[in-house]
């Protein structure tokens, strides 16, 4: 299949509509019947605020996260419409890819 690999970058403690962004995105992805999502937790990062974000022994809410998915063009359009209509502000990257299963 042809489509996109989308990566959303955020930090663990950030919320949107009273939910953690990761959970909000996963809920929307399920509603749109997108087949899967992978969440990666990173040790350290910094973004547009130029602050270092990292996981700490006592505090994990500042830990950087990436939410990754592979979607068709139609799914991509629907997902970004949901994001726009809810006014979620989140960094993303989107690349054209071929994806599927080996057998």
Segment roles from a protein language model:
Residues 1-103:
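Positively charged, small/polar-rich N-terminal and surface patches that mediate targeting and assembly
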């Amino acid at each position: 299949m042809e489509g996109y690999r989308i990566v959303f970058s955020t930090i663990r403690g950030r919320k949107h509509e009273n939910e953690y962004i990761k959970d909000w995105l996963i809920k929307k992805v399920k509603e749109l019947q997108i087949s899967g999502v992978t969440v990666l937790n990173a040790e350290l990062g910094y973004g547009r605020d130029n602050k270092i974000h990292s996981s700490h022994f006592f505090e994990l809410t500042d830990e950087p996260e990436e939410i990754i998915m592979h979607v068709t063009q139609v799914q991509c359009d629907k997902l970004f419409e949901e994001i726009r209509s809810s006014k979620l502000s989140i960094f993303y990257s989107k690349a054209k890819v071929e994806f599927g299963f080996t057998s």
